Amino acid sequence: MQTATEVNSGRQAYIIGNNEAANAYFRSAAQRDPNYIYGTALRQGIWSYVGRTEYAAGRFPQAREALDRALSANNDENIARLYLGLTLAQTGDRQKGLQEIEGSLKGMQSWLEYITETFRYSFGRFWDPGYEIRSAIKGDLAMISSRELDWQRLITESEWLGKRMEEEGDLARRQEALENSRDAGGRGNQP
């Protein structure tokens, strides 16, 4: 219970940009349970959160260590892969960074398409309903495949995408709860 509380507090701090506080919460949670996974649809390990907040604080060696650990536990964790790519790009390994960023963008795009199609009659319809995230991913993938790669733009947009994916889970859950409450006539789950 304590670990979940720390992760929730860390997520809230991270979303509003209080990265040092978020990092402290995530590191404490990782000490308690280094295998902790947050989320249901978009599952993320605690080391992904540690790595993202280290990245946001500009501590790239610590970010890389945590993100490598996250990906060794779950190689399909696209947000961790995105931030590993950003970390590599920020530390001078742009070729490898670009590979990781591109792979993560393709993974996020596939994941969003899977969720929104497979679960379109349930929770999937609440994920990226305005195609904002998928449009940004498509634009970044087009930029990567062109010969006109703007690194600053790619980094800025990738950071936005990472944060936006984090927020999207909360937005989808809130919208689903609101609709369920409306469908129940404001009674929640009461008969």
For the regions a protein language model found, what residue spans apply to each?
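TPR/TPR-like (Sel1-like) alpha-helical repeat modules
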Residues: 30, 78, 86-113, 138-146
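Terminal, low-structured helical/coil segments at or just beyond the last alpha-helical repeat
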Residues: 111-191
